[in-house]
Amino acid sequence: MPLLPRRFRKGVFYLSKISVIGAGSVGATIANDLMIQGVASEIVLIDVNKQKAMGEALDIYQGAPFHSPAIVRSGDYEDAAGSDIVVITCGIARKPGMSRLDLAQTNVNILKQITPQIVKYAPDAIYILVSNPVDILTYVFTKISGLPERQIIGSGTILDTSRLRYDLSHHYKIAQKNIHAYVYGEHGDTSFIPWSLADISGCSLHEFEELMLKKGAIDYRVHPGLTLKYVQK
């Protein structure tokens, strides 16, 4: 079990607190993962639907004895006071046929409503925005919150990057942890992949494919410890 992180502020050590705004599938999953990883001593779920936030928090908290001793609870914006990190996931979900930009105005309006309330109680927190369209919402949050840019992070193309590595892992039958590839740009239709930066265990994709053809590999399965040394002649 990982040790709960300790922070140093005003001469004393204290345990960390993370608030998640939005108790939908994304917010609840993030809160659950935070509990499993043991990265916070207190996790607060905040949602306009208080009953849903309470239910999700209880489900997560009841699983805590098997993972970490973190406190998981629901609350209001004032309960986010003292948070080290605030994750914003609220907003409407994308429906079939909608682009991320179609969500822009609705989710911008939602963000405008919650920003003054959360910033009032957690002005020193690091804010991580996950809601779509994430690039636009991160920009809007920066403008209306009045917080320094160093306190604001957008999830960007991390999900796109994760999906890319999954696809490459599936294609080459190589463990994802040995694949290094990235998606750049916005989280949307204009993102792109710099293939020249992609590699598998230090080999470019072109080099890896040539190696597989040259060696006549007969067995390279997905395995947690797989490296190129397992390529057989």
Predicted regions and their residues:
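Conserved N-terminal Rossmann-fold NAD(P) cofactor-binding segment
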Residues: 42, 46-83, 98
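Structural motif
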Residues: 17, 84-85, 126
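Rossmann-like NAD(P)(H) cofactor-binding subdomain of soluble oxidoreductases
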Residues: 99-165
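C-terminal substrate-binding/catalytic lobe of Rossmann-fold NAD(P)-dependent dehydrogenases
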Residues: 145-151, 160-233
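Conserved NAD(P)H cofactor-binding loop of Rossmann-fold oxidoreductase domains
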Residues: 90-92
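NAD(P)+-binding Rossmann beta1-loop-alpha1 motif at the extreme N-terminus of oxidoreductases
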Residues: 13-56
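Short, Lys/Arg-enriched N-terminal segments with co-localized hydrophobic residues
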Residues: 3-14
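Redox-cofactor binding/interface segments in oxidoreductases and associated redox assembly factors
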Residues: 86-88, 129-130
